[in-house]
Regions:
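Amphipathic, Lys/Arg-enriched alpha-helical "gate/interface" segment within cytosolic domains
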Residues: 1-158
Length: 158
C-alpha cells in the first residue's frame, strides 16, 4: 500500500484539543488549542506522524478554531518538517474568519510559490472542492472528515 492509499479517520490528539485525518493524498488538521506552546507544536507534529505513518502528502488543510501558530512556531514546524525528511505540501488551505490570517496565507503563497488559498468558515464546501483538484481524495470525503473533526472537538460545522 502506498502512502496515498492510506485513510486515517479523524483522530483526536493533544488530549482532545486537536484532530488529524488523512484522506489518501490530503491531510486535515483541526485544532482548538487556546494557547500554543513550542512543546504542544512538537507533540502535535509527532502525534500526526505516528498516526499518519510518516508519509508526506501533496495537499493539506488546516483549521485553527483557537489560537494559530505564531511566527516562531511556524518556523519551528518548518524546521521540524525538514529535519524529519518530509516534503512540504504543494497545495495548502486554511479556514479562518480572520481577514488578517487569510491575507497572511496569501502573502505566504506569493513568497514561497506555494499553491495556497484561505477560505472563510462559511465557504468550507468551496475549500473542499479546491483542495482536492487533481487529487485522489474527494471533496465529499474531505467535508465528511472536517465535519467529524468538528464534532470530535465539540464544535459544529455550519
Amino acid at each position: 500500500m502506498t502512502g496515498f492509499q492510506k485513510v486515517v479517520k479523524p483522530t483526536l490528539l493533544l488530549n482532545g484539543k486537536a484532530c488529524f485525518a488523512q484522506l489518501h493524498d490530503v491531510t486535515l488538521i483541526v485544532s482548538d488549542v487556546p494557547k500554543w506552546t513550542n512543546e504542544l507544536v512538537l507533540e502535535y507534529l509527532n502525534g500526526m506522524t505516528k498516526i499518519g505513518g510518516g508519509v508526506s502528502v501533496p495537499a493539506s488543510v488546516a483549521v485553527f478554531l483557537g489560537e494559530s501558530f505564531d511566527a516562531g512556531q511556524r518556523k519551528l514546524s518548518t524546521e521540524w518538517i525538514e529535519e524529519n525528511g518530509f516534503q512540504p505540501a504543494k497545495r495548502i488551505t486554511m479556514i479562518s474568519d480572520s481577514l488578517l490570517i487569510r491575507g497572511s496565507l496569501t502573502a505566504y503563497s506569493w513568497l514561497t510559490k506555494t499553491e495556497a488559498k484561505a477560505f472563510a468558515m462559511k465557504d468550507h464546501k468551496a475549500m473542499c472542492d479546491w483542495i482536492v483538484r487533481e487529487r485522489i481524495a474527494t471533496a465529499t470525503d474531505v467535508h465528511e472528515a472536517l465535519s467529524i473533526s468538528f464534532h470530535l472537538l465539540g464544535k459544529k460545522l455550519l
